[in-house]
Amino acid sequence: MSEAEARPTNFIRQIIDEDLASGKHTTVHTRFPPEPNGYLHIGHAKSICLNFGIAQDYQGQCNLRFDDTNPVKEDIEYVDSIKNDVEWLGFHWSGDIRYSSDYFDQLHAYAVELINKGLAYVDELTPEQIREYRGTLTAPGKNSPFRDRSVEENLALFEKMRTGGFEEGKACLRAKIDMASPFIVMRDPVLYRIKFAEHHQTGNKWCIYPMYDFTHCISDALEGITHSLCTLEFQDNRRLYDWVLDNITIPVHPRQYEFSRLNLEYTVMSKRKLNLLVTDKHVEGWDDPRMPTISGLRRRGYTAASIREFCKRIGVTKQDNTIEMASLESCIREDLNENAPRAMAVIDPVKLVIENYPQGESEMVTMPNHPNKLEMGSREVPFSGEIWIDRADFREEANKQYKRLVMGKEVRLRNAYVIKAERVEKDAEGNITTIFCTYDADTLSKDPADGRKVKGVIHWVSAAHALPIEIRLYDRLFSVPNPGAAEDFLSVINPESLVIKQGYGEPSLKAAVAGKAFQFEREGYFCLDSRYATADKLVFNRTVGLRDTWAKAGE
């Protein structure tokens, strides 16, 4: 498949193709403009992949611009996190990082231009009165008593705002458009408000800050953006986007196009709700592996490639829909099945003693790092007469469908010997503490010589060589597909979204590094935790299971 054929197709790319073919544009210039007031989530990843992906495919440019117009909610911590997330996803912005605050002088000048044209006025209604005067979806708004001030008075009052002559909330600059417009966004929207707060880029130079709708379109124009891509909630705002650019002296007039935002099952995307999860300590922070944040997904073990693939699969449309969590999980499962080396770990261990194995001895068995990729090599794993197996891999009695170890029957130990369960020891409560077996010494990685069939295979870890590991079994954060629809979304948090186990891993896991995934054979995909793991304490996070257990549960 050629590069052109491999490109995704969607309505935005069709618009770009038409613009280039008609000569409307000779190049493509997009931007990703996050507000630095929180951590990016999987929904932002869709926008990142769209904007940067288009720039890559059309040999154009994509700017990273921070929409930093509200100093009260913003922080340099979020700036650094967002930069890191964009780079981790595999994208690079054009030129230097931009900030909307870079344009504060020009934005102020354009506001003055609107005042001079009689298209903006200083309003002294309270914020509550402004909301009251705005009207509703079914009732028109009404004009502010301050709407018809003269140009000279508005210029003087706007300067008074700029120099700190008003208290916060006592005055604002509004566009003079139409209070009877069927679109509420066009009912004299606020362009500037007063905030006495230090800005992370401009310090205390300003005490008036432009609103998003005023800033966004002008920043796009100043940067020469050709296609301004937003999610559907900004569809009505396009009217204000165009109104501002139509009424100021600026040579470039970008066009805004809207696409559906990403809604994902079993999670929430609302910044307010995510913040509540963090502040009320329902999760351990913004990078908690159960969170839909990019930092949380990364810590859980998701790869950048899997997130890019997910964004490619869901596509770009104008219809809002909710994507199944299984779709995201299948992307990382396919990625790691193809690329993750294998290792053995026992999550719920029970001791198994091979009574006829030479006491005190051990040997090395060779195991492939990947069953289908010889180029990934092999490793030597120690084997001895005392091993750990998973408790679920043994039953005293079982039906024919159970293909693991059963009392009096045989099973194969992965890449090692055939063993037979002979007896067990139990504690006072009746729990099995030790399984005693015998082994066939002539079955190391080969079938029994007499031709008997041994169907089951289980994994194991040599007890004498095992590494104690903590295993964090992460699952979906909520127990229902649409937690946002619940009366109290916190009431449907999945109580088993994190289960912590103490188990054992093979010695090769000592070399594990954060961000590098393994398939724990027969268990799932895991990675070393970047927060809790130390040289003396190995902590592994489950990224995803080997199969979709939620689909099975719902059948």
Swiss-Prot record:
Q: Which reaction does it catalyse?
A: tRNA(Gln) + L-glutamine + ATP = L-glutaminyl-tRNA(Gln) + AMP + diphosphate
Q: Where is this motif: 'KMSKS' region?
A: 268-272
Tell me the enzyme class: ligase
- Keyword check for Cytoplasm: yes
| Gene3D superfamilies tied to this protein | Glutamyl-trna Synthetase, Domain 2 (1.10.1160.10), Glutamyl-tRNA Synthetase, Domain 3 (3.90.800.10), HUPs (3.40.50.620), Ribosomal Protein L25, Chain P (2.40.240.10)
Output the InterPro entries linked to this UniProt entry: aa-tRNA-synth_I_CS (IPR001412), Gln-tRNA-synth (IPR004514), Gln/Glu-tRNA_Ligase (IPR050132), Gln_tRNA_ligase_bac (IPR022861), Glu/Gln-tRNA-synth (IPR000924), Glu/Gln-tRNA-synth_Ib_cat-dom (IPR020058), Glu/Gln-tRNA-synth_Ib_codon-bd (IPR020059), Glu_tRNA_lig_a-bdl (IPR020061)
Residues involved in ATP binding: 35-37, 41-47, 231, 261-262, 269-271
Q: Which GO terms describe its molecular function?
A: ATP binding; glutamine-tRNA ligase activity
- Region listing for Interaction with tRNA, in residue ranges: 317-324
* A GO CC annotation given for this chain: cytosol
Give the UniProt record's GO annotations in the biological process aspect: glutaminyl-tRNA aminoacylation; glutamyl-tRNA aminoacylation
Q: Where in the cell is it found?
A: Cytoplasm
Which Enzyme Commission number(s) are on file for it? 6.1.1.18
Keyword annotations from UniProtKB, A to Z: Aminoacyl-tRNA synthetase, ATP-binding, Cytoplasm, Ligase, Nucleotide-binding, Protein biosynthesis
Q: Where does L-glutamine bind?
A: D67, Y212
Q: Which family does it belong to?
A: Belongs to the class-I aminoacyl-tRNA synthetase family.
Assembly with partners or alone:
Monomer.
Annotated protein name in UniProt = Glutamine--tRNA ligase
- Please give the organism: Salmonella paratyphi B (strain ATCC BAA-1250 / SPB7)
